[in-house]
């Protein structure tokens, strides 16, 4: 069983009962992470890249014996906290009983695949996309959008055959009619067993299109309605 709490924007807290994985902490208006820190919970912060809506330097305030930081190599945290590792796309890390792989991005940084217990084949796996997406902007030039598609296909190809329990992926309103394109291509390649969670909305809540539902009607989707919402899977 795994509990997921939406912090804000692309920020999530995933609690597997043993430790709490905090992805792309940007803000936490409900002070959920602080409450867990005060209770002595083990906190692992994952930072996909340096954009201000994915990385808040204040996460150093959580540093302590129960805290780890796993960051893309461009995130300036090394030397500022006690336990920090940096990664780049294509690299693996094993910390305690947790295995981590950093996949690529179509913007800055990378994306994270986390297996929560390497000793248990049935343990939960988590994918957080960071800014990995098909960034097709309707007002952009054909050349730029062709480049965006090539970049997306290159990174999505690395995900072919991946199976995850929980996936968090951008569905950005600013892309207008193209807002689902990245999610659709992601789900064509990746099996999501427990839940697909849209993030990075930059606008109203997402209503899956008829086309999306026709393709992936069997994929469980949870869309948080507000900051602080949580669900157990």
Regions found by a protein language model. Give the residues of each.
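Metallo-beta-lactamase
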Residues: 67-123, 218-233
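Active-site HxH/HxHxD metal-binding segment of metal-dependent hydrolases
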Residues: 32-93
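Active-site environment of divalent metal-dependent phosphoester hydrolases
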Residues: 28-31, 50-55, 75-79, 91-93, ...
């Amino acid at each position: 069983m795994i509990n997921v709490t939406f912090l804000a924007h692309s920020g999530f807290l995933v609690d597997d009962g043993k430790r709490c994985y905090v992805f792309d902490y940007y803000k936490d208006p409900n002070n959920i992470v602080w409450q867990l820190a005060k209770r002595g919970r083990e906190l692992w912060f994952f930072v996909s890249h340096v954009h201000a809506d994915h990385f808040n330097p204040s996460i150093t305030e959580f540093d302590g014996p129960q805290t780890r930081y796993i960051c893309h190599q461009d995130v300036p945290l090394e030397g500022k906290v006690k336990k920090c590792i940096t990664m780049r796309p294509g690299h693996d890390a094993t910390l305690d009983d947790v295995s981590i792989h950093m996949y690529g991005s179509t913007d800055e940084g990378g994306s994270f695949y986390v297996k929560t217990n390497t000793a248990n084949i049935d343990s939960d796996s988590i994918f957080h996309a960071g800014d990995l997406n098909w960034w097709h902007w309707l007002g952009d030039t054909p050349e730029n959008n062709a480049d965006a598609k090539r970049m997306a296909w290159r990174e999505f190809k690395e995900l072919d055959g991946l199976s995850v329990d929980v996936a968090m992926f951008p569905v950005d309103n600013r892309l207008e009619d193209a807002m689902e394109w990245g999610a659709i291509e992601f789900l064509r390649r990746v099996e999501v067993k427990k839940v697909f969670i849209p993030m990075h909305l930059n606008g109203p809540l997402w209503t899956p299109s008829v086309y999306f539902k026709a393709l992936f009607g069997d994929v469980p989707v949870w869309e948080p309605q507000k900051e602080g919402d949580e669900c157990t899977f």
